[in-house]
Structure formats: structure tokens, C-alpha cells
């Protein structure tokens, strides 16, 4: 994660001084490695944090979206920006599973994928837990299934491909979801042709795992659990089975394993044979039947992985790829974004964090969506993050460079964009590097970002508040990091009074993007 600071006297003709000159990237590898060792880390622990106050001071409740066993879900509107979000409010009690709720927060903070619900911020008070996330106005996939009954293969493949991408990403991150079902798949928006964009939600029962781990806790929802969960000896393959159940329901209009009660359902799952004789099933394409067979493979060790499922022939057709690419990449826009990547720089981490917060709060902005679409296009293996070879391919494709030129650019860009130093470029890292942040500098957006740092709400930012923000990442908790932050703070505190005023903060943001 991270956002760049401009050079004052170079690249004036770009009209966006947030980017540094290409000379930055001709420094030798030793200097780059040294820069990484001496840099602060900007990751989601910094950007997504406990706001230490009742969210109703920042957001207004619009309407109640639902009520569950332990709390409520509300539609919110940001008082400054007017943007809409969802908020889950959980009452702390002996009956609410606080451990699972904290687990969900911690896992969501690590995830950055277009098909996974994004957490924006949270607050843990004495009596309640508040979680603020994206708002998906179209509701649950479950409700769509009730209305529609049966989906066409085009409609179903579009949904299943997205879910598999989310599952593959989670598994790569060492996370098992353990409760994939239509109620935990939200519809974010619809295409004009009716195709649904979806996001996976509810990570309360998810769990970190290592390859080969076997888990014994009985977790999940009756229709969607695989045989090995019933036997209490399962791994990440359980998620793939659940995706298979969702796929069967979409295509056939009923669960593959049914019964009068849970015992009947578990018995049917334990046998593992689903109905293939119905007229609806018989009309499915051979590719659809084959993928269902692989997803619902009884033996978990023989079950297809989410990664391999994404390459299945059901998705690997020209018709599907045309269907899935609902966005069109404008050649000129792509050229500008790829060019912006080259000038990306992050030498004042406080400025980076301010702009990172603005982007995180504005991911539904059209420019962010364009950049996200480019990210998806560059992500050739669909694992939700960019590797260096994918960036090299992108430069060869979009900038007409040979492999040596593309490698040189990718090497330099990669080091500057990967400011959490995990060896990959995540979606938001990429987006922040290739868009013009000028789109986020309305007075209300600036005040929202200012308030992100102004923890006590006194109208000024202290160095201790900045340190507190960055120390939320354990990787920054050291004296060297504190000294670096103080030096960067002094660069922004123009009048030297020991605080950053809103005027100084606004000048910082506007100054680094002015031509």
C-alpha cells in the first residue's frame, strides 16, 4: 500500500505532480534494498483501524437493513462525503461470540479482493462492536435464487467464477472460509444484461490454516458442508465443495443433498450421490456437469482446487471470456495509468497514508473502478495479486516494450508500489499508484482524511496521533520508526508549532497533485 509524493521540479508536463521522474528508477538495486529496509510499512493495520469513537459521530443511520441473533445491520451515510456504507452492530453479551467477531475483523483487514466484502473501519466499545463495510444494495444471492429459481449457464458461470476467484485468493492467503452459501454472497451490482457481480461475506467462522492441516470443529450450514466436515477431519477443500453446492442450486433450482431435517441432509451428504436424473440436470452442458462432478468429489484429496477450477473448460471458452469481460479498457486511459505507475513514489509515508485512506474510502469512484478493471486484466492467473512477471507482460502488451525494457520498468515500479513489502502488488496498492488522486480533494474528502488522523477531534494532528496510527501495525513498533515519522511530520508542519492544522494538511494533499 502507499501513495507517492511529487518531485517539485520534474514531470510538470504530466499535469499530476504526485509522480516522480523516471530517474528515480535508475538507482541501483543496493540502494533500493536499503530503502526498503529503512522504510515504514503502510498496510491495512494502519488504514483499517478502530476509530475509537461511536461511528454515529461520523455517520448517520439511514435505515435498518436487518436484524440477526446478536445484532443489527444498518445503512449508513457519511456525514461529510454523503457516501453510503453498511454497519453491523453487535451487542456484547454472554450469548454473542465476541471471539468470532474479532476474528472476522482481523481476517477482513488482511483481504483486498474485488469479490470479497471490504471493511472500512470498526469500533470496539464497552458494550458493542461496530463493523463498517461496503454496502451492497442488491442484497443476498439467496434472495435472487428464491425469485429466479433457476439460472442459465451464462448467469451461473459468471457468479461461480467470481466466487472461485475469492476462494482461491483466500486459500492463497491461508484462510478457509468454512461457511460459503448464498446467504453469505452479496450482490454488489448488476450489468445491463442482468449478470450479477458478487462479493463473499461473513468471515466469522473462517480460520487460518497451513497446507495439510486437518480441522475437527463442526462448522458450516447443513446443505453446504462436505462429508469430511461431518467426519470432523477436513481442510480447505471444504470451501470448494460448498461452491459446488451453490453451483448446483443455481443450475438446478434445488440443493444436491436434501432432506426433511439436518440428520436427513447429513445422511445424504455422507452417501455423496446427488441427483443427475432430473430433466434440468440432463440439459446442462457436459462442461457444467464435469465441473460439478469435480467440485462435489466425495474424496477431498481428489477434489479440484479453486485454482484449477478457474481453468476448467466451463470458463475457458471464447464466449465466457467475452461475457466475463464486461468492462472495456480504454486504450488512452490504460496508457495514462501505466505511465503513472512509472512515476509512483512514496517518500513521505504520512502523505501516503492520507491518500491511501482517501482511496480506500472511495473505491466505488469511476477512476478507481477503471484502475481495478486494469488490475483484473493484468492479473493473468486470477489470484487477486500481481507478481512481477504479470507486470512485465502488461508493459509488453500495453506499452509495446521488449522484454528487457519491460523487465527494467517492472523491477523499479514493483519496489515502489509494494510498500507493505509482501512480495506482491495488491489491488489497492495498484489503484493508488495509477490513478490521479486529484479526484479525491473536495473539502469534505479532505476533512474526512484529516479526521482519520485527528484521533481526539481537537482540530489538529499531533505527532503522537500519527505515531499511534502507524504503530497499529506491529511492523512499525520500534524507535527507528518513531524517529522517521517525526521527521516526516516536521516536513508537513510548515509553521513548526508541533501540530498539523487542517490548512497544512490540505496544502500537503493539494501541493503534491498540483501541476
Predicted features and spans:
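Conserved short submotifs of the Hanks-type protein kinase catalytic core
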Residues: 127-140, 144
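Conserved N-lobe beta3->alphaC-helix segment of eukaryotic protein kinase catalytic domains
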Residues: 89-111
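A short, aromatic-enriched beta-strand patch in the conserved N-lobe beta-sheet
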Residues: 121-122
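Conserved N-lobe ATP-binding subsite of Hanks-type protein kinase domains
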Residues: 72
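Amphipathic regulatory helices of Ca2+-sensor modules
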Residues: 355-356, 387-401, 426-437, 462-475, ...
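Activation segment signature within eukaryotic-like protein kinase domains
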Residues: 159-160
Amino acid at each position: 500500500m502507499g501513495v507517492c509524493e511529487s518531485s517539485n521540479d520534474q514531470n510538470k508536463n504530466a499535469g499530476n505532480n504526485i509522480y516522480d521522474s523516471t530517474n528515480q528508477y535508475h538507482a541501483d538495486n543496493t540502494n533500493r534494498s536499503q530503502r526498503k529496509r529503512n522504510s515504514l510499512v503502510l498496510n491495512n493495520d494502519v488504514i483499517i483501524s478502530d476509530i475509537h469513537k461511536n461511528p454515529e459521530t461520523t455517520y448517520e443511520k439511514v435505515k435498518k437493513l436487518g436484524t440477526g441473533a446478536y445484532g443489527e445491520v444498518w445503512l449508513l451515510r457519511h456525514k461529510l462525503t454523503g457516501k453510503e456504507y453498511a454497519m453491523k452492530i453487535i451487542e456484547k453479551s454472554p450469548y454473542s461470540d465476541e471471539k468470532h467477531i474479532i476474528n472476522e475483523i482481523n481476517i477482513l483487514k488482511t483481504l483486498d479482493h474485488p469479490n470479497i466484502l471490504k471493511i472500512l473501519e470498526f469500533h470496539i466499545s464497552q458494550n458493542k462492536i461496530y463493523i463498517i463495510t461496503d454496502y451492497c444494495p442488491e442484497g443476498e444471492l439467496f434472495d435472487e435464487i428464491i425469485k429466479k429459481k433457476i439460472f442459465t449457464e451464462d448467469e451461473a458461470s459468471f457468479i461461480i467464477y467470481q466466487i472461485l476467484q475469492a476462494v482461491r485468493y483466500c486459500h492463497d492467503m491461508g484462510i478457509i472460509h468454512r461457511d460459503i452459501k448464498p446467504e453469505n454472497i452479496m450482490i454488489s451490482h448488476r450489468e445491463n444484461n442482468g449478470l450479477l457481480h458478487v462479493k463473499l461475506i461473513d468471515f466469522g467462522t473462517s480460520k487460518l490454516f497451513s497446507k495439510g492441516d486437518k480441522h475437527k470443529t463442526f462448522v458450516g450450514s447443513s446443505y453446504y458442508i462436505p462429508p469430511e466436515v461431518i467426519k470432523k477431519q477436513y481442510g480447505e477443500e471444504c470451501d470448494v465443495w460448498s461452491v459446488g453446492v451453490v453451483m448446483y442450486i443455481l443450475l438446478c433450482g434445488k440443493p444436491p443433498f436434501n432432506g426433511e431435517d439436518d440428520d436427513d441432509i447429513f445422511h445424504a451428504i455422507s452417501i455423496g450421490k446427488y441427483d443427475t436424473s432430473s430433466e434440468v440436470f440432463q440439459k446442462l452442458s457436459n462442461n457444467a456437469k464435469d465441473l460439478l462432478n469435480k467440485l462435489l468429489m466425495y474424496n477431498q484429496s481428489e477434489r479440484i482446487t479453486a485454482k484449477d477450477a478457474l481453468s476448467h473448460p466451463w470458463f475457458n471458452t471464447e464466449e465466457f471470456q467475452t461475457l466475463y469481460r464486461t468492462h472495456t479498457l480504454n486504450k488512452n486511459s490504460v496508457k495514462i495509468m501505466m505511465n503513472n505507475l512509472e512515476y509512483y513514489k512514496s517518500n513521505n509515508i504520512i502523505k501516503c497514508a492520507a491518500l491511501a485512506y482517501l482511496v480506500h474510502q472511495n473505491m466505488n469512484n469511476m477512476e478507481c473502478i477503471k484502475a481495478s478493471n486494469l488490475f483484473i486484466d493484468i492479473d493473468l492467473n486470477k489470484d487477486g495479486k500481481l507478481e512481477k512477471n504479470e507486470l512485465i507482460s502488461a508493459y509488453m502488451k500495453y506499452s509495446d516494450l521488449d522484454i528487457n525494457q519491460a523487465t527494467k520498468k517492472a523491477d523499479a515500479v514493483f519496489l515502489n508500489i509494494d510498500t507493505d513489502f509482501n512480495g506482491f502488488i495488491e489491488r489497492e496498492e495498484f489503484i493508488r499508484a495509477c490513478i490521479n488522486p486529484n479526484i479525491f480533494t473536495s473539502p469534505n474528502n479532505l476533512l474526512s482524511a484529516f479526521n482519520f488522523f485527528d484521533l481526539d477531534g481537537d482540530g489538529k494532528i499531533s505527532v503522537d496521533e500519527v505515531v499511534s496510527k502507524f504503530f497499529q501495525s506491529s511492523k512499525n513498533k520500534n524507535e527507528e520508526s518513531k524517529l522517521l515519522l517525526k521527521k516526516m511530520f516536521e516536513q508537513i508542519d510548515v509553521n513548526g508549532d508541533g501540530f498539523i492544522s487542517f490548512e497544512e494538511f490540505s496544502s500537503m494533499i493539494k501541493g503534491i497533485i498540483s501541476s
